[in-house]
């Protein structure tokens, strides 16, 4: 099981119903170019073509990390000195709600409150998750619907101050910027209407295994990535169905990122958690 490439043609060897299956990458995955440095030594011969195995991301359970383009302190200084883009028009008043105050059974694993994230740096002073009230209530409804199937929601991030988005953008190498928001436009996280999340098993309390890890900047993160196991794809779909039923849409390059339908109605925010 894995991902392979031959002359720009990429395929996945995946498990389906206990059998191995070869599937080509869909058109929406072709924007993710293959770095020659990811080609491993092993190969797969399919229809007389030799495909070399790709190392698209870290091993399961390992956090994806980048080498930032500048030191953390420089990134922070520049971001705090900058201002969010000016916006015109009428917006709804900000009403950020802390998710755990609505349902204590929702779990948190706020990666940016520690160093277990793609930049290996701490951005939040405490592990908290906020969303605009309608988005927060919709998230709780999705969580409660999932409990009937033996799962709950594990939150990685919600409202994200704009200055943090600016730091992510400035730190990320150009080829990987499809995975981070452009601060000149602001992000849905900045508006309090985007949530990063996964499932956890109610019986064990442990997060489930998805086709990629959180914040992995590779094609495995795409919501329509065809690889992985049947169970991983089924769990990804279970999460997506629950979130879409409550008015969320999955982000095109991240299976864990969901935007609430009314995100355009809220202003970009840059307040720290302590200021909320």
Language model segments and positions:
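Extracytoplasmic cell-surface/polysaccharide-interacting catalytic and binding patches
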Residues: 59-156, 171-253, 262-276
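Peripheral terminal and inter-domain segments
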Residues: 1-78
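K/E-rich alpha-helical interaction surfaces of small helical-bundle regulatory domains
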Residues: 1-10, 243-247, 254, 259
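Generic detector of bulky aromatic hydrophobic side chains
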Residues: 23, 41-43, 47, 112, ...
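Beta-rich nucleic-acid/ligand-interaction surfaces
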Residues: 162-168, 258-265
